[in-house]
């Protein structure tokens, strides 16, 4: 069976990149608020024995978002975690994310139109033009940020506004 062909022009890929990166820039601010809301003394909170701790989930969210952007820029996906040293506390994690996520987005912004259209293997599961993986970063971030936001109130924290107000941070439209 041959790989599916994608009718993707370089011009469309550039426009799609800019649209997706603008959205990711907005998501960065929301994710940073959720990360910063983790109570330092409750990092080991785990809602279920099968669940990750709040800290494990937060580091996975932050580091994998950045790693995926870096892998898009490199046009190569690897299973090995890129970032070995975790930040030491919640404030450092939020700052790490705020520093690394935009610089990784800048690397993606520098890809040529032709590079954006180049098919890249995704962990040996399938291959798509590299531009399409930006939506994976967005989905990954939203998925794990949603999980983490459900940990906040049971940990004694406040849930920030995400896509509208929360009981703790009402929308001020």
Model-derived segments and spans:
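Short, low-complexity N-terminal intrinsically disordered segments enriched in polar/charged residues
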Residues: 9-18
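Acidic catalytic patch
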Residues: 109-124
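Hydrophobic packing residues in well-ordered alpha-helices of helical domains and bundles
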Residues: 20, 24, 90-97, 101, ...
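Helix-adjacent hinge/juxtasegments
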Residues: 70-111
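Short, contiguous alpha-helical
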Residues: 2-3, 7, 21-35, 42-83, ...
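Short, solvent-exposed, charged loop/turn and helix-capping segments
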Residues: 38-41, 109-111
């Amino acid at each position: 069976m041959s790989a599916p062909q994608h009718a993707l022009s370089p011009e469309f890929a550039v426009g799609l990149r800019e649209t997706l990166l603008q959205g990711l820039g907005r998501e960065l601010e929301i994710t940073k608020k959720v990360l910063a809301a983790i109570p330092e003394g409750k990092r080991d909170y785990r809602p279920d024995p099968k669940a990750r701790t709040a800290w494990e989930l937060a580091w996975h969210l932050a580091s994998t978002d950045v790693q995926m952007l870096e892998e898009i820029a490199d046009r190569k996906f690897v299973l090995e975690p890129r970032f070995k040293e975790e930040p030491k506390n919640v404030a450092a994690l939020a700052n790490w994310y705020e520093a690394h996520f935009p610089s990784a987005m800048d690397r993606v912004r520098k890809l040529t139109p032709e590079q954006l259209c180049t098919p890249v293997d995704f962990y040996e599961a399938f291959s798509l033009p590299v531009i399409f993986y930006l939506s994976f970063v967005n989905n990954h971030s939203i998925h794990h940020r949603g999980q983490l936001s459900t940990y906040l109130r049971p940990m004694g924290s406040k849930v920030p506004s995400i896509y509208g107000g929360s009981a703790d941070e009402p929308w001020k439209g």
